[in-house]
Amino acid sequence: RSYPKNLSGNSERDKMDKIYFLSQSTSLILIIVISLVFAVLGLHYSKKFQGINNYLTANRNIGLFSLTTSLVASALGAWILFGPVSAATWGGIGAVIGYALGTAFPMIFLIYFGKKIRSDFPKGASLIEYMRRKFGKSLFKLILLMTIFYMFIFLCAEVTAVAVLINYLSGTELWITALIVLISTLTYTLYGGLRASIFTDNIQMIVIGILLLILISIISSSSGSNFSFEFVESKNPQLLSSSYIPTYTAGLTFFIAVAATNLFHQGNWQRVYAAKNYQTLKISLIISFFIIIPIICLMGFIGMVSFSLDSSVRPDLGFFTLLLKDQTELLSLMIVVLGLSLTISTVDTLVNAISSLFVVDGKATFKLNKYTDYLKISK
């Protein structure tokens, strides 16, 4: 087995004689296997749920467990392994709280607005469709373009994040990871639609939850007394200080940026309509809110601990620095599975969301002849 020469993210890793945690062949096999497993599961499950209603809104019949795991899995992409960890090293506890609240806030917003939109437009499938019918076509195309652009950028960021992660662990070329993940996800998502996305989200969230618990527990136990607010305060008191101005500016910036963009996430609005009733939607959103908050906060705290232990560590690699300090191959394999599960759960949501907008809003946008199959065009 092979190990990296250092964990600092410094230039040494850019030398020709890199040594990694995993061999490229091992990581490549794992990427292919994990991607294929989710693709086969999605394709097999969605065979019995065909039709436009299942593709767009899962026939409006999703229960509490499936809806909750899907909402959380879709919200938590591979970015959680990098973003909050890095932000905590310069923005302190305020950045972490802002990140967490920004990610979870849409769940609270959807409790109230979700009820209204389901009541006013019970047969809908998207926020943009609702806005077009409620307020006219004046801003419709602009909002549609902005929504698709945001989700496309989100999709690119997710695929890039997991590709960078696996490159860091094994040296696998970025395009190889990205291509495998995209092809497998597109295959089952464009075939099975929202049904396939939600079903695979359920499995992915179970995998994500178990692996996060294991990996964070390992970090906590191996760090000992260093895994505490007291240790962070002794090394970098500004990160926990109420008088540290960047903590407020960073927190507010992250909250506004993350919350505002997620409110236009079509994947969330599809799930609002997919819930079998409003009570299921409400409980699911509340549970999702209280699952997301501690996960983001824990990742941010890990970033502060890592930075306090060694300020020379590249900020976005803090999670891996603490976890892989003993250079364990098994942990590297677990990280690959975690990263792929986080990414695929988010990417399938984004792919189906973008596709659904073409189906739902395509007629009003392109105005083709009445026999046009917008579902086929979207695929």
Region roles according to the model:
Residues 63-71, 105-108, 137-150, 179-181, ...:
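Select transmembrane alpha-helical segments in multipass membrane proteins
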Residues 40-48, 152-159, 172-180, 184-190, ...:
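Hydrophobic alpha-helical segments and their helix-loop junctions in multi-pass secondary transporters
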Residues 56-123, 256, 268-311, 321-342:
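Membrane-interface helix-loop-helix modules in multi-pass membrane proteins
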Residues 124-132, 193-202, 264-294, 315-318, ...:
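Hydrophobic, small-residue-rich membrane helices and short re-entrant helix-turn-helix hairpins
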Residues 137-141, 152, 356-379:
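Loop-to-transmembrane helix boundary motifs in multi-pass membrane proteins
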Residues 97-189, 257-258, 339-349:
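Helix-loop-helix module between adjacent transmembrane segments
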Residues 145-156, 207-218, 249-263, 278-308, ...:
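Selective recognition of specific alpha-helical transmembrane segments in multi-pass small-molecule
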Residues 17-82, 189-192, 205, 211, ...:
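Membrane-interface "cap" regions at the ends of multi-pass membrane proteins
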